[in-house]
Amino acid sequence: MTEIRLVKAEDVEGIAELEKKCFTDPWSLIDFEGAVLSPVTTGLVALEEGELVGYGFIAIVFEDADVANIAVSPLHRKKGVGRRLLEELLTTAKERGVQRVFLEVRVSNAPAISLYQGFGFQTVNVRKKYYPDGEDAYLMALEL
């Protein structure tokens, strides 16, 4: 069974390592340390038998939120881990009075786009050359 809990400071190194396995343009260790310390950001980790298999961060400012980062270990994908993380992040947002949630996703990331659409996210814009490698991003939004 996957355990979802709040990020702790000691999780940051493992999160940064998993980030490198999941993304071609990973956040740095310093980025994650900043996210954990930020008063507007909530981070969650997913654990399988104590092993870090996923994480997600959401930044909440007044009635808006941004899913800043969400990732699942390649070995644990298609098992509902990403869905559970996103559910918990959205629950956190609702509990804090958020009305709109935004996120960016690579236009080539069909599995993530499908997950987000399943939660009701809609594409509202395209951010041209958003990623360091020049790939576009969809800006997606969800009204809570």
Regions found by a protein language model. Name each.
Residues Y116, F121, M140:
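Conserved active-site tyrosine of GNAT-family acetyltransferases
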Residues K78-T91, S114-G118:
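Conserved acetyl-CoA-binding loop-helix of GNAT-fold acetyltransferases
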Residues S73-L75, K79, V107-N109:
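Active-site acidic-Proline motif in GNAT/NAT acetyltransferases
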Residues T2-I4:
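Extreme N-terminal starter segment of soluble prokaryotic enzymes
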Residues L6-L75, L86-E88, T92, R96, ...:
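Acetyl-CoA-dependent GNAT
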Residues Q99, R106-I113, K129-L144:
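C-terminal "cap" of GNAT-fold acetyltransferases
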